[in-house]
């Protein structure tokens, strides 16, 4: 029989626990008992495994011992962090009644629910990464997707049209928690993701969603937010907002608006492209040697998060980009002065979210005060910068002199971690608080004087006055001198080496101290809550200030990077094309111990595709990726690593670079490669930048070459995308002769004996050979194997002197022109003697031949 079925047989306290647990059956319940959070029954067993804590038993209830595990309240943040990182959610149940006045168990209630996507506590968050809660909805017309960063109030929705776009969004946003409807059809799209939460269908109803959102924003309709005609996105947003409210158990005043993210506003990159370009995560899953690792020297966590959002959503609006470029140029002479001051601002964005949720701690308010104290100097430094966008940011960041003054008066310089510890509110802020503190301090002084007086009066040098939470104040005398205690000393406690006593005078002062300390602490908590009430009316302006400071941090950082790393300002042109002079790979040039070989690139409507040949390790992939990264950097407004760059409009960036088996989905390397290729051929346009590396290598030579040729033809002739096409199929170097807008380039290498030197420089024309054996030798393949390979190569070349192609009718026939296999029907006819057939046999042969066709 389960605990809940045998409800009446339990003790009153366990009945209270079981009622609360029944409201949160799917998640762990932290049940506050004194100085511990306790977990019982299955929760205790689960927590014991997840947190590696002891599983014990507590007495008995309903005749059965109760499995129990507990954690001390002061260490709860560490344990919550571990659980959240494992995708768990926790309901925090606190004592809200007074034990002194309670009849039966102290009243308790769940005050908040901590989930991976709704955390705002500093200890639980990674400071330089967004932590998103997301919801996904699907109907016959496509998907709806909404994300919320509860630690900043940033609320977004979109309507991905197809599965590929939805997959790219999931990869870009990487939510910590994902809500989905119970009838969600495309489970393979989200399986294996962390923090999956199945929600009932009614939470996704469109009318409920509109009502929820209008109530949150205080509006009559959603037209002003530009989301009125996005029903699928609104369904997801409604569910998400309801979940956030349910878990936080409070209003969410910092969520003030919702924004529609449209495909046409940014350069679209699918999941494979984001992975291959290693924007914020390398192929091994780490953060080293990524584009963000080079570009992100921001000095505030909120600036770092904003830069990563820019990198994952490059904007197509050249007006915004030119404004950013102009700002970066204007700030280059001011970075050394601005960055140290900006560093002091800290993570104002997340502090404001905790303020809105009323969970901000004393040190949060101290940091907010410190941020306000930087504003006058920042504003003074920016005043001399000749740039309209910079001046707009300066105005947006505000001054908040009154709030700064309030916090300077209210909070001590270095407050304790928690307000319940007391000593947070500064002296002089509140007269009544000062009076209670003076009483408590005065009584403490008296007790010190009492100790000196009694020691002198009794002549007992081991006598001292002390305090503990159970017995209150006492006079302690060592066991050796206890027989000399005066007659008016009343024994209170006996210890191994000492006796403790009380006298009426001490008891009187104990009452006074405890009363004054209790009154002071209660008043301090009240004053602290009132500070929230004084700060929250300014929340909108404060959030705008935090946003402006984060943007300033990003732009100052990009200005510093441009100067330090010798980047130049790219020029935007109207027609499709990319012209790069002396381009460099932003990441590779930072990790090389030798100078990076810069290379040019020229793509235009008249030169749409480059067929890139050259040896493995020659630099083909680096050359292709650097082109995409330079384009990406240009479209976040950054300066770029080159001598000169002109870049036209780009709607999408695709990369088909490298592949591995997708064992989880049962897809081979070749299947993964072809799926990514199909996505490109279906979605690329003349404004797309396409990187194709080694198409067709996952299958037989003829099949692979055929596919590579057909893909290149389609991209060059039909789609007309700007394409870099790297290949080892030398037959493809004939494409420029057969099609307009295609050109050959190659990466150079020099071979000397058994060694090879990679020049890493891009030259016009096709490569003369692939240097495969030299690369194999360089990789350490045994010499006898290399020697045998050379023999075999000479044999093959002697059979087909022109290795790649054979001359037929004066034209060059590539491997594509393989003689067609003889039809079985033709073979059968050749072996047939019609003169020897009877009429019946002839009829049978007609049917047989028909079946062979």
Curated annotation (Swiss-Prot):
Annotated GO MF terms: ATP binding; ATP-dependent DNA damage sensor activity; damaged DNA binding; mismatched DNA binding
Keyword Transcription regulation applies: no
Disulfide bridges in this chain: none
Annotated positions binding ATP: 614-621
Biological process, per Gene Ontology: mismatch repair
Entries under InterPro entries matching the protein: DNA_mismatch_repair_MutS (IPR005748), DNA_mismatch_repair_MutS-lik_N (IPR007695), DNA_mismatch_repair_MutS/MSH (IPR017261), DNA_mismatch_repair_MutS_C (IPR000432), DNA_mismatch_repair_MutS_clamp (IPR007861), DNA_mismatch_repair_MutS_core (IPR007696), DNA_mismatch_repair_MutS_N (IPR016151), DNA_mismatch_repair_MutS_sf (IPR036187)
One annotated Gene Ontology cellular component of this protein: cytosol
UniProt xrefs under SUPFAM superfamilies: DNA repair protein MutS, domain I, DNA repair protein MutS, domain II, DNA repair protein MutS, domain III, P-loop containing nucleoside triphosphate hydrolases
A Pfam family recorded for this sequence: MutS_V
UniProt keyword annotations, A-Z: ATP-binding, DNA damage, DNA repair, DNA-binding, Nucleotide-binding
Entry function: This protein is involved in the repair of mismatches in DNA. It is possible that it carries out the mismatch recognition step. This protein has a weak ATPase activity.
Family that this chain belongs to: Belongs to the DNA mismatch repair MutS family.
Protein name stated in the entry: DNA mismatch repair protein MutS
Taxonomic classification: Bacteria, Pseudomonadati, Pseudomonadota, Gammaproteobacteria, Enterobacterales
